[in-house]
Amino acid sequence: MPGPTQTLSPNGENNNDVIHDNGTIIPFRKHTVRGERSYSWGMAVNVYSTSITQETMSRHDIIAWVNDIVCLNYIKVEQLSSGAAYCQFMDMLFPGCISLKKVKFQAKLEHEYIHNFKLLQASFKRMNVDKVIPVEKLVKGRFQDNLDFIQWFKKFFDANYDGKEYDPMEARQGQDALPPPDPGEQIFNLPKKPHHANSPTAGAARSSPIAKPGSTSSRPSSAKKAVPCPSVKSDKDLETQVSHLNEQVHSLKIALEGVEKERDFYFGKLREIELLCQEHGQEGDDLLQRLMDILYSSEEQESHTEQHEGEEEQEHGHEEAEQQEEY
């Protein structure tokens, strides 16, 4: 039974215990040997400031930062409403505090988003993070709600990241992290400003800031960086892809103009033939009448005529065969 200062989660384990994917529970211990360091956490540094400062990143910079750190391909802040990115951030900050196998990285429905945020909230509780997640607002995918939360989480990340290396793709164990569906902005509307992994805004995520007044603990800074993501396309690659697509569109437009000119040319020829037939149509010439019939016939009439001619040829062939048999 737990001591008087311990509390149990609904599943029976201590709130700070590590839960393995197979259900095994490793009790939390503040003082462990070096080999168990990945499962030994102190209390997370809580961040309460939500005001806009000079360190606050724009929507484009914040998405570039998310993609760079955890190897995703998000293009809008609203796509963070799935909660999957936050779950991986927590695994990066506090390895083992959340089971990534339970995270739905390909979530497309609201109840799947809620599932991910429940896992995130459980990891917050396990790490004594005081932040209350506004799940009902975030899963609706509204821009401002998701922007406010990711701005807070960026500050929380900077206050707790110790600079250790982390491979997000390996941590996901092969799970495809597809961005949630979004009918809005397309890939052609991406910002042209490049966001490199070694930029000042992205680099800020790899070192802990100076301790703010009122903070009781801090983590040491480190020069180590997260493992770079080969799967995330840079803005330069996307601009090159857009340029190639624009060239294809231009080539198709030129081909279409050529086809339209050819169409107009032959239409003019047919119009001249039509006028000539109309001028001499009163003479009762059978040839002119047949030309007029061809000019004014529809597709259905042509197909019916071809079918009729085919039947006549078939009947004629049967008659010839019968005559040969008689001989």
UniProtKB/Swiss-Prot annotation:
Keyword Cell cycle: yes
Purpose: May be involved in microtubule polymerization, and spindle function by stabilizing microtubules and anchoring them at centrosomes.
GO term, biological process aspect, one: spindle assembly
Superkingdom of origin organism: Eukaryota
The Calponin-homology (CH) domain, residue ranges: 56-158
Family to which the UniProt record says this protein belongs: Belongs to the MAPRE family.
Source species taxonomy: Eukaryota, Metazoa, Chordata, Craniata, Vertebrata
Composition bias type Polar residues, residue spans: 1-17
Alphabetized PANTHER family for the sequence: MICROTUBULE-ASSOCIATED PROTEIN RP/EB FAMILY MEMBER (PTHR10623)
Primary subcellular site in the record, as a coarse category: cytoplasm
Keywords: Cell cycle, Cell division, Cytoplasm, Cytoskeleton, Microtubule, Mitosis
Domain notes: The N-terminal domain may form a hydrophobic cleft involved in microtubule binding and the C-terminal may be involved in the formation of mutually exclusive complexes with APC and DCTN1.
Protein name in UniProt: Microtubule-associated protein RP/EB family member 2
InterPro entries, per the entry: CH_dom, CH_dom_sf, EB1_C, EB1_C_sf, MAPRE
Natural source organism: Xenopus laevis (African clawed frog)
Record-level Gene Ontology MF annotations: microtubule plus-end binding
Cell compartment(s), UniProt: Cytoplasm; Cytoplasm, Cytoskeleton
Name of the coding gene: mapre2
Region (Disordered) residue spans: 1-20, 170-238, 295-327
